[in-house]
């Protein structure tokens, strides 16, 4: 089973069409990985689906880097 970090990076790569090797934890979805606002919405939806959690809009707006996505999932994952 892949860990959360690997799963988040895989989703980011698939959603944004970037190579997984280019994705660093500190990568910004918009500044480093070229995401636009629609990409970020779709990315949040993909994370919600993968991890079976709901990310409220006000929380989703705060998730701007790969590490923030990993941290959010770790904190809110259904145990």
Swiss-Prot record:
Q: Where is the Carrier domain?
A: 2-77
Where mainly found? cytoplasm
Q: Which pathway does the database say it acts in?
A: Lipid metabolism; fatty acid biosynthesis
**GO BP terms, alphabetized:** lipid A biosynthetic process
Modification sites for O-(pantetheine 4'-phosphoryl)serine: 37
Q: Which Pfam families match?
A: PP-binding
After translation, the protein is modified as follows: 4'-phosphopantetheine is transferred from CoA to a specific serine of apo-ACP by AcpS. This modification is essential for activity because fatty acids are bound in thioester linkage to the sulfhydryl of the prosthetic group.
Q: List membrane-spanning regions.
A: none
Q: Which UniProt keywords apply?
A: Cytoplasm, Fatty acid biosynthesis, Fatty acid metabolism, Lipid biosynthesis, Lipid metabolism, Phosphopantetheine, Phosphoprotein
Q: GO terms for molecular function, please?
A: acyl binding; acyl carrier activity
- Which GO CC annotations does the UniProt entry carry? cytosol; membrane
Q: What are the subcellular locations of this protein?
A: Cytoplasm
Its function?
A: Carrier of the growing fatty acid chain in fatty acid biosynthesis.
Family the entry assigns = Belongs to the acyl carrier protein (ACP) family.
> What is this protein's record name?
Acyl carrier protein
Starting at the broadest rank, the lineage of the source organism is: Bacteria, Pseudomonadati, Pseudomonadota, Betaproteobacteria, Rhodocyclales
């Amino acid at each position: 089973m892949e860990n959360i970090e690997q799963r988040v990076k895989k989703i980011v790569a698939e959603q944004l069409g970037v190579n997984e090797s280019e994705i660093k934890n500190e990568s910004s979805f918009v500044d480093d990985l070229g995401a636009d606002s629609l990409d970020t919405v779709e990315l949040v939806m993909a994370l919600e689906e993968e991890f079976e959690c709901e990310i409220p809009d006000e929380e989703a707006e705060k998730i701007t880097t790969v590490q923030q996505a990993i941290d959010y999932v770790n904190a809110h994952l259904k145990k």
